[in-house]
């Protein structure tokens, strides 16, 4: 009889070999090593052991399958989280006010200085100025060429402001000589009376020294501070300050002009520009307008304050004077308290504009202490090149207000630094611009649109990670799409180049027209000015300087040149239309080819590469480079995990669906397998015992191993095989019959790991094709390219990714802070240790352990 050993190849069996036992052993003993001992107790133990082991194996397979199934989701979600974080940071950055940003502006080739000061006009909301709001200002490190006769803003300021006052105020020659004598003003403590005394050595009263001046022609005597007058040749002849520097004398002006609160700008139009040499590393500022200036701010010293009506109080003083003839103009005294005043050039005397409805006064104030000022009403003023005698109010100002400006406004030095330049070409000039100057320019397109494009590109890349094998099979199609796309880009660039040529021609036409108009305007204004006041500036035409007029604007023959320009514009129009038509055809062909998810994924990669090309040109802002550094750091630290997860996804993509369906198949046919195992068990017993229980137990209790050579088994091999074939005819395939007919060989092949597939693989394949799989179908469809973008769990992963990134950044910051604190503690400990040793050394030196000093003894 042949004995057979089973090594776990039959479902329900275990790996421990089945051996024959002695007759002294009982059937109930060692049932753990004899799973086919046919009794109820051992059968129950066998079933329980099988079920526990199968559950454990199923749990392990489910955990591995779950891990592999989630890996590709993690990759996509990580990329989306990274894109979302980057977009959030850049969104926040784009919302911040930026004072400088890099850009290009075509302002002209060589910038030459120009003496054409009439090109500088008054632009603003003030009557007499042109309405204009498109102010711009740039900074550049380009050196500017200046001619010696270059006009400055100071000259234009004198001309424009003087023209406003000359045309708006009453003309009067008040800059005549006054016969003045020095006087002292003194007052008694008991009264408000002030006496006027003629003395040689004067003292200050109310913070000023005083003059009593007579103008014989007008029968007028004025009591005025010395600060308002200028002495001539150490005589008793004085004139108002500023008369020698001005040429327009006006007396009475409308109140709105004297208010001093009208802001204006001096601006130019192309082809002219204003340049301010800053003197720092050859940097310059170029723009179409100068700084904002104000009409009513006096020229010498302009500390002007704004406060409430309680800032200044009138001191009602009575002037005791000698007999006089005509008009005697007495000063008006104020005591003021200013807390936010700014003095120019660190001078103690300042000018203050104080106004109310229909009245205005200029106060000349002397600083008494930190915040207290003694002020008097001024008599004369200089605004531009207009010298005017300030009006005297009919009454004391009540509920007065004050206007405050910086000391630099209307500063002569600043206005002299702005010079007029002109150009006639178009040359890109690298500059940085201030965003608050009003220029209609935008930041580089790395804002919201680029963020959206980056998120779309990252999503496409995440989806293409699961469709890579599809994309690899259609490389030719992708290359064809790229070729069409490149052709579209080239056509667009060529069209833009032609449009730029058109713009250059159009710009030249505008410059020529503007030059002609500017020449006519210059001549008209010079004629008007010459007819009114004579030659007052370098005009290139009527002045005696003899500087020749630049005839470069008149070199072109208008009729010939304009016809040539028009013909060139028409030719360029035709070329542009042809190129754009070709670009449209290429784009249409590209869209026809561009119809698969893998092409979309490749387009996302190309889009991302184009966006990445913007990174080196983001500008000088350190914040953008910090953002890029953090993104690169995150990619470097996370790339090993991404690659490892991608490898797992690639290797496990084919088995994820089969594992799931295998598990599902097992649960569905578990009862059928149990029935088949029971049948095998019965067949085995029938073959071994031949229907005799005593003979089976006798064989079971023998000492010889059951190694497949039992005589009892060899007597009936055909009946055993026949029983198996009879039972399994309706269930297993022909291939399975052949394998079971030689159980030893099948078991050995299974144990060695080099055998064939599971006998039930055929029915498993049928189940895969016949039954679907809910969420796992999503995986399979995504791998096949029919599901383009994963969309499950995005908000959760996005939030979690943001939390992880912020936590990592905070963790590094806290660790750095801990290192700094540790270093500081070590430094402090070292310092304390050095101090301790020094003190200990000094203490030991001053208090030695043994004294060697002998004290004197007295007998």
Swiss-Prot record:
Extracellular face residues: 7-614
Transmembrane region(s): 615-635
InterPro entries per the UniProt record, alphabetical: GP41-like (IPR000328), Gp90_EIAV (IPR001361)
Coiled-coil parts of chain: 576-624, 663-699
Subunit and partners: The mature envelope protein (Env) consists of a trimer of SU-TM heterodimers attached by noncovalent interactions or by a labile interchain disulfide bond.
Gene giving rise to this polypeptide: env
Entry comment on modification after translation: Specific enzymatic cleavages in vivo yield mature proteins. Envelope glycoproteins are synthesized as an inactive precursor that is N-glycosylated and processed likely by host cell furin or by a furin-like protease in the Golgi to yield the mature SU and TM proteins. The cleavage site between SU and TM requires the minimal sequence [KR]-X-[KR]-R.
GO molecular function terms attached to this record: structural molecule activity
Fusion peptide: annotated segments: 446-466
Cytoplasmic topological domain residue ranges: 636-859
Superkingdom of origin: Viruses
Propeptide regions on this chain: 1-6
A GO cellular component entry from the record: host cell plasma membrane
Stated name of the protein: Envelope glycoprotein
Ranges where the record places region Immunosuppression: 498-513
CDD domains listed in its UniProt record: HIV-1-like_HR1-HR2 (cd09909)
